[in-house]
Amino acid sequence: MLIIISKSDNYYRLGIENMEVYLDNNATTMVDPKVYDAMKPFFCDMYGNPNSLHKFGAGTHPKMVEALNYLYEGINAADEDDIIITANATESNNWVLKGVWIDLILNGNKNHIITTEVEHPTITATCKFLEDQGVSVTYLGVNDEGTIDASSVRNAIREDTALVSVMWANNETGKLFPIKEIGQICKDNNVLFHSDATQAIGKVIVDVQD
């Protein structure tokens, strides 16, 4: 990287040449050194399966419980049944949408899902798959501020609406969506509500009881 500072017409100008800037940290970012130091023992020394009966697993099990309790407290979960641990957000989103499809659509009388045009690809791709299976999907557009109005969700709900899926924080713009208001609308209309809150965790207060 080459930084050039020059003075012209009593103004200083800063020039940067051959500089690479990584702008995808919301998707994947480097591990914080403090996190690396905290996890290193479990990569090299305490690597036993925490659910195993042997002593190597018994040594790691308390640490797993400690981490889970930290997670429960961080989102104000009432008990461990409020959380289902999955491998990643992709698995979680697929699990929810396809689970609703099987339970309420294939085995019920509801055939409609509402989502937005700016969801993460794990949502939009799954919705496209469900459309191929005959599910009706409504994609709501965003307003001038890059988010959606809760009223647009209310207006899109039909008698056969099974699920509303709206992200909390957009992974590209960082815009927050009014999920509390949307959730109340869904509750009032007896519609399931799902939010991909992946980008909100660690950035805003998350309270699953709120």
Regions found by a protein language model. Give the residues of each.
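Pyridoxal 5′-phosphate
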Residues: 4-210
